[in-house]
Amino acid sequence: MRSAFFLGVDAVAISNRSTAPVSPVALKASAGASESLPLISVNQPGTFLDSCRNNGWKIYAANAATGADPNQRSGNKTYVSASALGNPIQNHACILILGSEGEGLRWNIKKKADYDVCVEGPRMGQGRVDSLNVSVAAGLLCETFLRRPKRIGAPRDDLPDGSQARNHQEVTSGELLF
């Protein structure tokens, strides 16, 4: 919850059936974020997701990377790596669903997703570590979803000293922009 609040998530929905109740220890660890971030208690996650979709939301299911090409389409679902995701929240309201540490998402919930999204590391397929723990993956995915687009150039009249700003077409590769 702390990372979700810090990164700008609007609310967190928690299933009543398949998750442990939010404990006082978890609330304390959230460092106050749980008091500022709406927590939605969901009795029927499948029905909740259907209702969200009917109201225009896109649903993304976080899954462990498999090593196969993640940027593909199968049936009515698109598989995408976080690095190729872009900034989906700029285009539509989004729900990111996360599963448990060991089991991941239940099949009946996973099938509700429009997209399967994974975080791929540079060492995929090398060694025995093939995934992240859920909290780390959640933080990385939330940052990806909520990342603000970078402004490369400023309007000509934005600079206080009267100097001229370059527009984005004038920026060449290899330049470092802050």
Model-derived features with residue positions:
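Post-transcriptional modification and biogenesis factors for structured RNAs
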Residues: M1-F178
